[in-house]
Curated annotation (Swiss-Prot):
<dbReference type="InterPro" id="IPR003509">
    <property type="entry name" value="UPF0102_YraN-like"/>
</dbReference>
<feature type="compositionally biased region" description="Polar residues">
    <location>
        <begin position="1"/>
        <end position="19"/>
    </location>
</feature>
<dbReference type="InterPro" id="IPR011856">
    <property type="entry name" value="tRNA_endonuc-like_dom_sf"/>
</dbReference>
<protein>
    <recommendedName>
        <fullName>UPF0102 protein YraN</fullName>
    </recommendedName>
</protein>
<dbReference type="GO" id="GO:0003676">
    <property type="term" value="F:nucleic acid binding"/>
</dbReference>
<dbReference type="Pfam" id="PF02021">
    <property type="entry name" value="UPF0102"/>
</dbReference>
<dbReference type="InterPro" id="IPR011335">
    <property type="entry name" value="Restrct_endonuc-II-like"/>
</dbReference>
<feature type="region of interest" description="Disordered">
    <location>
        <begin position="1"/>
        <end position="20"/>
    </location>
</feature>
<comment type="similarity">
    <text>Belongs to the UPF0102 family.</text>
</comment>
Length: 131
């Protein structure tokens, strides 16, 4: 877990959620620096969550943000399992339907922004509904 300094100067442990939120903010800023536009964050649909929804031109980009301190267990990108991909696809499908769209009518893709240590890896079109 990450730590942050407090007013007293002693570090305080961040919760897993706080750590995840901080990396999602970093990913959003990083992607905006690459020209993507922010749409939404932490989108929940029936138990699934999408970290970020961005736009690149006319493409809706669903982004999964991952962080690992090291590559010891495969790094951040390797942690997006088939099961997680399935859940992200289902959540995106529901979000699109709520916004009068579908995979057939909206140009979209699924990206992963993976932070491993101090490295950033942007995997465009990491998986799709045909995977």
């Amino acid at each position: 877990m990450a730590t942050v300094p407090t007013r007293s100067g002693s570090p305080r442990q961040l919760t897993t959620k706080q750590t995840g939120d901080a990396w999602e903010v970093q990913a959003r800023r990083w992607l905006e620096g690459k020209g993507l536009r922010f749409v939404a964050a932490n989108v929940n649909e029936r138990g699934g969550e999408i970290d970020l929804i961005m736009r690149e031109g006319r493409t809706t980009v669903f982004v999964e943000v991952r962080y690992r301190r090291s590559v010891l267990y495969g790094g951040a990108a390797a942690s997006v399992t088939r099961s997680k991909q399935h859940k992200l696809l289902q959540t995106a499908r529901l979000w699109l339907a709520r916004h009068n769209g579908s995979f057939d009518t909206v140009d979209c893709r699924f990206d992963v922004v993976a932070f491993t240590g101090n490295e950033v890896e942007w995997i465009k079109d990491a998986f799709n509904d045909h995977s």
